[in-house]
Amino acid sequence: MPAVTYEHIKTCKQSGARLGIVHTPHGSFETPMFMPVGTKATVKTMSPEELRQIEAKIILGNTYHLWLQPGNDIIKQVGGLHNFMNWDGPILTDSGGFQVFSLSNLRKITEESVEFRHHTNGLKLFLSPEKSMEIQNDLGSDIMMAFDECPPMPSEYKYVKDSIERTTRWAERCLNAHKRPEDQALFGIIQGGEYKDLREQSAKELVALDFPGYAIGGLSVGEPKPVMYEMVEHTVQYMPDDKPRYLMGVGSPDALIECSIRGMDMFDCVLPTRIARNGTCMTSNGRLVIKNAKYANDFKPLDENCDCYTCKNYSRAYIRHLIKAEETFGIRLTTIHNLHFLLKLMEDIRQAIREDRLLDFKDEFFEQYGLNVENPKNF
């Protein structure tokens, strides 16, 4: 029995989206689900108690950052990430691959590993499939990700083909090096850039290795959204129905709806927390930039349709003042709101699937959010 399993509840008759439950050693969560990102063992400015209050069910930790600071050996001493950060729900850790490929300019890819320089002190480091598994086994996450290569978009066909074949070989090495399959589930990551045949090849090769779950990687890296939707739609048909499907790095409201419609179950992104730090808020009427002068004496909540802690207690004028004054409390309030907004959106998506009306919900949401106009204010 794998450490993580997927239970299918129903398929939306109108859209084909799926409602399910993912069961993990630290509890279960309904899908489709958005997962807040806690890069360095904290969702920035939020306590675990606050995450529970906004109904976050599963959070992410970042293997690359936790390996470099404080070190996986320290986290292992206390029994893993759950104890270290006092979060008793499910945790997913990424493999570190994306950071190596995005943060480090100086890198050398060989069959054995990736050689790169530390993004702050320039020290030479190596990350391999085996090392990634060792770190993630020490972190003790419920879901671990295979170490993959993330080719930039766009890349030449030949380069991407070589890359996905290496990713498959690395995936096999990850499976062999993974020491705790009974209480940690290792997911494979499908790559292939914007080439449909390579996405298909990558999916088929990884499905043959029989991981307990699968992710689509290498999207939401700057390509136009229609390209991303096309790649998801094409790839999902090669992913097993009886295992979780995770779309990495997606967190804009429109993409969460569109990719739920296309059959994905799990999503993560730093977007809601990152934009909160400069005062950009997601609301039911679209994007709101709280620093704008027009909010200086606006005493309404960020979103009159929202019942989060921020919207129930504080005004736009007050939050604008805090953000302009660079007060940490302002960032806490916008972070709470943005994460609550996305988690509530996912709840609404799940309810619409239950009622077989996700396409209707999409139309209503897009209309109110202001996405049906030319050049909408989006993320």
Curated annotation (Swiss-Prot):
Reactions accelerated catalytically: 7-aminomethyl-7-carbaguanine + guanosine(34) in tRNA = 7-aminomethyl-7-carbaguanosine(34) in tRNA + guanine
Keyword Metal-binding annotated: yes
Active site feature: 94 (proton acceptor), 268 (nucleophile)
SUPFAM superfamilies in alphabetical order: tRNA-guanine transglycosylase
Molecular-function annotations in GO: metal ion binding; tRNA-guanosine(34) queuine transglycosylase activity
Record's keyword terms, sorted: Glycosyltransferase, Metal-binding, Queuosine biosynthesis, Transferase, tRNA processing, Zinc
Binding site for substrate: 94-98, 148, 191, 218
UniProt: Zn(2+) binding residues: 306, 308, 311, 337
Presence of the UniProt keyword Metal-binding in the record: yes
EC number: 2.4.2.29
Cofactor(s) it depends on: Zn(2+)
Gene Ontology annotations of biological process type: queuosine biosynthetic process; tRNA wobble guanine modification; tRNA-guanine transglycosylation
Top-rank EC class of the record's enzyme: transferase
Assembly: Homodimer. Within each dimer, one monomer is responsible for RNA recognition and catalysis, while the other monomer binds to the replacement base PreQ1.
Family: Belongs to the queuine tRNA-ribosyltransferase family.
Protein name listed in UniProt: Queuine tRNA-ribosyltransferase
Organism: Staphylococcus haemolyticus (strain JCSC1435)
Gene: tgt
